[in-house]
Amino acid sequence: MDRMDSSDEEIDNISDDELQSGDEIEVESSNSPLRLNYILGNEIGRGAFSIVREATSRATGTKVAIKSINTRFIKNKLLMREIEIMKKVGDHPNILKLYEVYETTKHLHLVLELVTGGELFDKIVQRGEYSEQDASKIVRQIVSAVGHLHANGIAHRDLKPQNLLCAGEEGDDIRVADFGLSKIFGDGDYLETCCGSPEYVAPEVLECKPYDKACDLWSVGVITYVLLTGCFPFWDKNNAVLYEKIRNVDYGWPEGLEVSNEAKDLVSHLIEKNPEKRFTFEQCLIHPWVTGEGVSNARKIKPFQQQQPNNR
């Protein structure tokens, strides 16, 4: 389902998913600073206005990813904000690192940490099955990254599986990515932009009420539910019906699916309509299911079955 971007604040980002033909992104000339410092390799990804290539540092031999963005289509202020945020929080082990930025008249080249495992849920599907212990480890890393963002005055606002990358082939070393909708805020500040991906967005955002960083913890709750069940807690082909289910927190657990009480307890404190009652990242990090102490490791989860939850 498409992302929602509507408000008093114009939204754009540098992480578009779909390819558009037309304006190709030219690689800089051989004597450009970028080429002098990096050996460019194969294309490994492409967005509407960007190309990602694998590259190697001439100085250190380190493998990196270089994202080249055609700035003709991107609002410079928002792009600069995304870069500022990535520089500010990239010292966390579970946040995708931005090493350098090269700017020309037509393009921005972002030198990024190279992650080779792909998107989190694609990796899980490849594995075929996993345990609550595996899910707990993944959620623990996501919450740790979210905590680092919040401690630095940043709300991500678009946490979803597509923005969770695997650093390696095993799929258990997570990086939070895509800060195109992220926002810097101060203590006591509220946000107003209605944005995010519908299945993962908090009810206060849908209702266009002032909201804060607690919206990210709702998204963590939805991600956790999907990890545990293989389906969304809120789902309908009709957006209006979907939004109503989210506003009413109308969800249940699939019949016949064994989920530990500790896991259900965590989800219930994250998928909580009142943001003031919703768990903070600090509360999540000490929850028994997140620490691993209250995790059931007996049941193997088969991800992404076609079943839908038994909504109450």
UniProtKB/Swiss-Prot annotation:
What biological-process terms (Gene Ontology) are attached? signal transduction
Q: Name one GO molecular function term.
A: myosin light chain kinase activity
Active site (record annotation): D158 (proton acceptor)
Q: Which SMART domains match?
A: S_TKc
Q: CDD domains from the entry? A: STKc_CAMK (cd05117)
Instruction: Give the E.C. number(s).
Output: 2.7.11.18
What function is annotated for this protein?
May phosphorylate a specific serine in the N-terminus of a myosin light chain.
Please give the name of this protein.
Probable myosin light chain kinase DDB_G0282429
Originating species? Dictyostelium discoideum (Social amoeba)
